[in-house]
Amino acid sequence: IHAYSGEKEIYSKTYYSIGGGFIVDEEHFGKDSVGDVSVPYPFKSATEMLGYCKQTGLSLSGMVMQNELALHSKQEIEDYFANVWQTMRACIDRGMNTEGVLPGPLRVPRRASALRRMLVTTDKFSNDPMNVVDWVNMFALAVNEENAAGGRVVTAPTNGACGIVPAVLAYYDHFIEPVTPDIYIRYFLAAGAIGALYKMNASISGAEVGCQGEVGVACSMAAAGLAELLGASPEQVCVAAEIGMEHNLGLTCDPVAGQVQVPCIERNAIASVKAINASRMAMRRTSEPRVSLDKVIETMYETGKDMNAKYRETSRGGLAIKVQCD
C-alpha cells in the first residue's frame, strides 16, 4: 500500500496473503501469529490430538470444543458456527439459483443451476443411486461458481477450495438427517482440527505447495468432519482425513488465465465426492493403516516444496498454458 500527497510518498506498507484468508504485514511475515494461549489440550500433531482423546474419552470434536471454551464463551462459539453454516447455506442457495456466465476472459458458463433443475425434475422418477453424487457435485459447483463471481463464501480453508466443506455438510443435511446446531458444530470442530494440523505443520496455500494444500486439505477436512458425524472414533476420523489427503498428493495449481475457475470449480466437486468416499472407507476398514495422518501431512509439505513453481498458482505451466482463451 502506498499513499501520496501530490508527488510525495507519505506512507508505505507491505502485506502478504499467506493462504486461507490470512494476511500479515511485512514485520510479522514468517513469524508465529499465535502467542501463549492456555488451552486444556494443546496439540501440534495428530498423534498428540489422539492421545488427548484416548486419555479423556472425548470425541475429537468434544476435545476441540474444550479448547474453544477456554478461549470463548459457549454462546460466542454457537453464534460463530451458526454464522458459518448460514453463510455456506446462503452461498449454495445463490449458486444453484443463478444462471449466466462467470466474469473473466474464459467466459465459463454457470452449471449448478441447470444441474439443480435437472435433478429436481428427475429425482422423483429415478432409481439411480448415483443421483446422490450429482447432488454433491451441484452443491460444490454452486459454491465455487459464487466464489468465481465474487460472491460471499467461507474460506474453509481457502477461496479456491471453498466448496468442499459446505458440499459435504449439505450432503449430510440432504441425504442423512437435517443438520442441527449440534451437528454442524461437531462437523466444523472436527474439520477445523484437521485444518489446523495442516496450517501448523504444512501449508494451505496453493502458491506454496500447489492445489494439494487447498483442495487436498479441504478434502481431508471434510472427510474428517463427515466421519465425526457418522459416529467414527477419533482414530477413524484421522484415517478419513489421511485418505482424503493421500489421494490428492502432488495435485498442481495451474489455473487457466489466472482465474479461479478452470480447473478449480470442477475440482471442488470431484474432491467433495472423494471426501465422502474417504470417510466411508475409513469407517469400514478393519486393518491398521500403514500411513498416518502426521506422515501424510509431512509428505504433502515436502512434495509441495519440491514442486516446480510452474505448478504453484503462477499459471506458467500445466493446463494454464495448454488451454487458450478465445
Where would I find each of the regions flagged by the language model?
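Long, contiguous hydrophobic alpha-helical segments, chiefly transmembrane helices and signal peptides
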Residues: 1, 15, 81-85, 92, ...
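Catalytic cores of large soluble enzymes that bind and process phosphate-bearing ligands
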Residues: 38-41, 52, 72-80, 84, ...
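Accessory "access/gating" subregions that flank catalytic or transport cores
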Residues: 72-210, 318-326
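Functionally critical mobile loop/hinge segments
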Residues: 224-326
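C-terminal regulatory domains involved in ligand/effector binding and gene-expression control
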Residues: 1-125
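Short acidic, glycine/serine/threonine-rich loops at helix termini
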Residues: 12, 168-169, 199-204, 249-257
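Contiguous, well-ordered alpha-helical segments that form the cores/surfaces of helical PPI scaffolds
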Residues: 138, 142, 163-173, 189-197, ...
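A short glycine-/small-residue-rich loop at the edge of a beta-strand within enzyme catalytic domains
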Residues: 159, 178, 182, 206-217, ...
